[in-house]
Amino acid sequence: MKNNDTIAAIATPPGRGGIGIVRISGTNLEQLAQTILGKLPDPRHAGLFNFLDQNNQVIDQGIVLYFPSPNSYTGEDVLELHGHGGPAVMNLLLTRCLQLGARLAEPGEFTLRAFLNEKLDLAQAEGVADLIEASTANAARCAVRSLHGEFSSAIHQLVSALIDLRVLVEATLDFPEEEIDFLQSAHAVEQLASIQTKLEQVLSASRRGNLLQEGIKVVLTGQPNVGKSSLLNRLAGDEIAIVTEIPGTTRDTIRQSIEIEGIPLHLIDTAGLRETSDIVEQHGIARAYAAIEQADLVLLLVDGRYGVTKEDHSVLARLPKELPVLTVHNKIDLSGQLSRIEEDTSGTAIYLSVKSGEGIELLRTVLLKTVGWQTNIAGEGAYMARQRHLQALLHAKELLKRAETWLHTADQLEILAEELRLAQQALSSITGEFTSDDLLGEIFSNFCIGK
């Protein structure tokens, strides 16, 4: 991927619309602008221009914005042609730019150039894509915070504190005769504890943001005819799955995404789990267990008239031990019970009626609580973190935990210094201060063309 040539792309979505935008970025765009527009636009002023082809015939007329470097999105000269949003017009404008020496931009290349020219750090650049992809209002707000640098600022504060501690440890290594007293007088233990506390706070906010971005996979499982498909329909507010009195009606996984308080939930209805000689149903049951392996949470539905049966215990025994399970006692309208939540050492159980709707709101609340979402603070203060961010934060947390041990071992300060260095490196990878070219290519390849 070259970074010193001129790139162009249609920056608006495919299809017809009132406005379409062709974006161009590069060095010395004056000649290209004068050729297409007849003259160079005034910087940072919206102007009305004719867009000209190679024969000086008008392709379209629209608004032009010109941002000379370095005061632009990419840090290079940027020209935006705002025309009528028809595919033919947009393609003619883009073709004209390519005729004049620009090349078609690769996905995410405008934002990559912004990163390389230090207009954005890597976390902010990812915030651009996350804002575009946000599916809920809370997710969009979190993405804006990342784009504005709040997540990066928190990471930079951690890195700065780590650097201060590393300087202290490295100085101690250079003057071994001062070793123990020097570390104690500088309160190194307290410094490390403070960093660990702040890291835990950032990790918590990042986990909440990750929930907003990726949502949670919730698998509905249990014996046939306990109300799994009916619950899917009730939560989705639509007749997504076929419901009958015939056991084994659901033969395949049925997926539906919903939103609860801004959190995307990806519901997966599965075939009823039982012993069967039906080949098709057996395949459905195999798919049910495969879906469970990928789940963040399992709802085990049981018939509230009979409670958790021997067959239900057999299902529970096959579930991954670390997987959160919420037992849902359905059909309380038939058993005369009241909707409620029960929690004990065996986990959480909720009693409801899918048919009447009694207890459904309780279920919504418990779903969020089970996955660690704090309703009272919603998305406030959350960072739109990706899986790579969480992995880096968790790796840094583990390294600092090991560093805590070595800090109390005066003859192992070299290992302590290395653990702190690696923790700093892990955190710096989030903002791109320590990042491989392969990772950059993977991140930006998932962006839109034109962004």
Swiss-Prot record:
Q: In which residues is (6S)-5-formyl-5,6,7,8-tetrahydrofolate bound?
A: 23, 80, 119, 451
* Record-level GO BP terms: tRNA methylation; tRNA wobble uridine modification
- Tell me how the cofactor is bound: Binds 1 potassium ion per subunit.
Which keywords describe this protein according to UniProt? Cytoplasm, GTP-binding, Hydrolase, Magnesium, Metal-binding, Nucleotide-binding, Potassium, tRNA processing
The positions annotated for binding K(+) are 225, 244, 246, 249
- Tell me yes or no: is Cytoplasm among this UniProt entry's keywords: yes
Sites binding GTP sit at 225-230, 244-250, 269-272
Q: Cellular component per GO?
A: cytosol
**Per its Swiss-Prot or TrEMBL entry, what cofactor is needed?**
K(+)
Enzyme Commission identifier(s): 3.6.-.-
Q: Does the keyword Hydrolase apply?
A: yes
UniProt GO molecular function: GTP binding; GTPase activity; metal ion binding
Checking Gene3D superfamilies in the record gives: P-loop containing nucleotide triphosphate hydrolases, Probable tRNA modification gtpase trme, domain 1, tRNA modification GTPase MnmE domain 2
Q: Which residues bind Mg(2+)?
A: 229, 250
Record-annotated TrmE-type G domain positions: 215-372
Top-tier EC class? hydrolase
Family, similarity comment: Belongs to the TRAFAC class TrmE-Era-EngA-EngB-Septin-like GTPase superfamily. TrmE GTPase family.
Sum up the protein's function in the record's words.
Exhibits a very high intrinsic GTPase hydrolysis rate. Involved in the addition of a carboxymethylaminomethyl (cmnm) group at the wobble position (U34) of certain tRNAs, forming tRNA-cmnm(5)s(2)U34.
- Name this polypeptide is given: tRNA modification GTPase MnmE
Organism lineage string:
Bacteria, Pseudomonadati, Pseudomonadota, Betaproteobacteria, Nitrosomonadales
Q: Which gene encodes it?
A: mnmE
